[in-house]
Amino acid sequence: MAGHSKWANIKHKKAKEDRKRGKLFSKLSKMITVAAREGGGDPEMNPDLRLAIQKAKDNNMPNDNIERAIKRGTGELEGVKYEKFVYEGYGPGGVALYLELMSDNRNRTAAEIRHVLSKNGGNLGESGCVSWMFKRRGQLIVDLNESDFDEDELMLEALEAGAEDVVTEDNLLTIYTDPSDFEEVRKQLEEQGIKFSSADIAMVPENNVNVDDKSTAKKVLKLMDALEDHDDVQEVYSNFDIPDEIMEEITEE
């Protein structure tokens, strides 16, 4: 399906497990610290910080942790200086990979990411090699199993609030917005009582690469997990689409 991220749905199902691991809090702290360092510690004046704080709150990160992360960014508390950068490359089956990273040692991170990729059938590419395959969009996900609203109601409310597109797959309804409309659309929908299981500005694939070979699909998922598990990787985006029947077979193994 064009313009939809299968990985976003898979990640949603893994989110509770991620929270237990505690790795998510570390990544969220880093995101807040870098946003505060680059744009100041006032979320009203810093949209990147506002988004990072909201994401932390969505994942039940304690306010004390959030405040400490902001102060590390503004210099009120001592902290590691992180650099923000992007890597692009390819995974098994030729799927595109777009990685957003934060690290205090870019050379170390580059070597480690290269190792993860080569070990799992992927490789780094030149800057710009896959970024044109993605579009930055607001992405709000509603779990229809947990929502008080049905699919038609949600679609109508979303479009009236200014959403660009609404897609339903695997009982997850994804609302896409222009990045500049993201906060306003979210605010309007929350005022209607709609709850989101995740809300973020993401790199969404313009078109998908169909991975209909089970062996390749397993390799893609293994690589995505390995990249997500790396401490310096903040976000992993990909354009793969694994058919439901193959996903079910893999899940049952």
UniProtKB/Swiss-Prot annotation:
GO cellular component: cytosol
GO biological process, one term: regulation of DNA-templated transcription
GO molecular function terms attached to this record: DNA binding
Disulfide bonds: none
Keywords: Cytoplasm, DNA-binding, Transcription, Transcription regulation
DNA-binding keyword on record: yes
Positions in coiled-coil regions: none
Region (Disordered): 1-21
Main location: cytoplasm
Compartment list: Cytoplasm
NCBIfam families: PRK00110.1 (NF001030), PRK12378.1 (NF009044), YebC/PmpR family DNA-binding transcriptional regulator (TIGR01033)
Family: Belongs to the TACO1 family.
Family matches, as PANTHER family: TRANSCRIPTIONAL REGULATORY PROTEIN YEBC-RELATED (PTHR12532:SF6), TRANSLATIONAL ACTIVATOR OF CYTOCHROME C OXIDASE 1 (PTHR12532)
Protein name per UniProt: Probable transcriptional regulatory protein Hore_12350
